[in-house]
Amino acid sequence: MTATLERRESANLWGRFCEFITSTENRLYIGWFGVIMIPCLLTAISVYIIAFVAAPPVDIDGIREPVSGSLLYGNNIISGSVIPMSNAIGLHFYPIWEAASLDEWLYNGGPYLMVVCHFLLGIACYMGREWELSFRLGMRPWIAVAYSAPVAAATAVFLIYPIGQGSFSDGMPLGISGTFNFMIVFQAEHNILMHPFHMLGVAGVFGGSLFSAMHGSLVTSSLIRETTENESANAGYKFGQEEETYNIVAAHGYFGRLIFQYASFNNSRSLHFFLAVWPVVGIWFTAMGISTMAFNLNGFNFNQSVVDSQGRVINTWADIINRANLGMEVMHERNAHNFPLDLASVEAPAVNG
């Protein structure tokens, strides 16, 4: 009898837990994805803050030359970062218990992998949680689909790229100057500026910013006048009011006259679909570009494409970029390589005699 009561109480407790987790009445929706998301993101944030403040230098290149990244080891907010894992570890899974000691784990950059793994799982679950809440409220799933763009971009730089390059040491450092270093080295090794998918991503991000500013300014300017022409149009409104304050027909008429008629949307759903799709598709393409360049399918190479009638090279901007790439490649990991990879890979000429 006692066992039966205990089982009932246990089942009742589990039922109440399930109800709490899936309730849309909570101030913050948790959801089943949230059960995984919350501990993962808390772990990633905690380890990141501790490592950014106090982690010892990391042997990122695997050549016994540690690089300092934390505030307590001489960095500031701009120069500091969580340094990627050592090249000596490669792609091995490297939790704390795989190291001989905590000092070894820190020296080889273990915190980086810990942050990245928990962060990627956390943001993936955040995306799932967006879908889950939409489902429970009877909404369509496009919020989660839109969020998949930054999730894909983060996965590309933190996971796909290191896998393609053979080492987590090639992942993006977790800091401001580290991000810039990653971008410069990426350009040097993969010529990303000449990759069409990156160009589409730039169009998506900059275009999305432009369209967002245009839409917001147009909506806030197209007021339905509630006052006479002798008063300010703003006098008929209070901040944060629930009633609609703008007239899409007026906005359509204004914009159609500013550019031309068919450059303007007269359908609110079409307009907002466009505003969502433009940046999302652009960032999807960038993530795909990073993922292909991870396996060295690089940007276009138009070096020395133009020659005169005597066969002499006439430099184009492609040649200028190539020269900059070689300079950047020479400078990075300068003690790990005797030559840039582009120069070292060329077969040496035969010597007669």
Curated annotation (Swiss-Prot):
EC code: 1.10.3.9
Listed GO MF terms: chlorophyll binding; electron transporter, transferring electrons within the cyclic electron transport pathway of photosynthesis activity; iron ion binding; oxidoreductase activity, acting on diphenols and related substances as donors, oxygen as acceptor; oxygen evolving activity
Propeptide, chain numbering: 345-353
N-acetylthreonine carried by residues: 2
Protein name: Photosystem II protein D1
Residues annotated as site: Cleavage: 344-345
Keyword Chloroplast: yes
Task of the protein: Photosystem II (PSII) is a light-driven water:plastoquinone oxidoreductase that uses light energy to abstract electrons from H(2)O, generating O(2) and a proton gradient subsequently used for ATP formation. It consists of a core antenna complex that captures photons, and an electron transfer chain that converts photonic excitation into a charge separation. The D1/D2 (PsbA/PsbD) reaction center heterodimer binds P680, the primary electron donor of PSII as well as several subsequent electron acceptors.
